[in-house]
Amino acid sequence: RFPEGDAPHRFDFSKNHILSSVDGILKRLNTEYLDILLLHRPDPLVEPEEVAEAFEALKASGKVKNFGVSNMSAAQIKLLSAYCSDPLIVNQLELSLKRIDWLEQGVLVNQKAGTDINFADGIIEHCRLEDIQIQAWAPLAYGMYSGREMENVTEADLQTKDLVQKMANEKGTST
C-alpha cells in the first residue's frame, strides 16, 4: 500500500495525471519503460482527447509500449479508441469460476434468470471483434480456489474448490 499522500483518491484520466502517474510508476519500479499501461476503471469525466495526447507522449518518449483498460464497457472502449492512434490491446475484467456473469450475459439472452447479471453487455464480443485481449483479474476468486479461508462459502463453492485442486494435482501445478 502506498503512503496516504501518494494513494490515488479518484479516477483521473487527465493528461497531466496520466503522465505524472507513469513517471511515479517508473521511479517506484526502477525501470525505464512499461510494456503496457492500463487505465483502471472508467473515469466518467474523461476527455478522450487528453488521454490520446498522454498516450502519444508516453509512446513517443518510450515510457510505455502498449495501452489497455480495465473494467470498461464496449462503449467506453469505442470512445477512447476513436481518439487514440495506438490500439487498446487489453481489457482487464473480473473473471473466475465464482464470477460467471461474463458467461451468463452471453447465454441468458431474453431470459428472466439473467435480470440480475452485472456485466457489460457485449463486452466479450466487442473485444473479440477488435482483437482486444481479455485479461482476468481475481481468476481464483480472491484466493477461494487456492486455499484462502473465505466467509459465506456455499457448498457449490467448496465442490468447485475441490475440483480445481484435483485438476491442479493432475496437471502437476499449484492453485
Put a short name on every predicted segment.
Residues R1-H9, Y33-L38, M144-Y145:
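N-terminal small/glycine-rich loop or linker at the start of catalytic domains
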Residues P3-H17, H40, L45, K112, ...:
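Active-site mouth loops of central-metabolism enzymes
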Residues P8, G24, R41, F67, ...:
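Short, flexible active-site loop motifs that bind/organize anionic cofactors or intermediates
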Residues F11-L29, E50, A75-L79, F119:
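Short, acidic/polar
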Residues L26-E47:
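Active-site groove signature of glycoside hydrolases
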Residues V46-T175:
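Beta/alpha (TIM)-barrel catalytic core signal, keyed to glycine-rich beta->alpha loops juxtaposed to Asp/Glu
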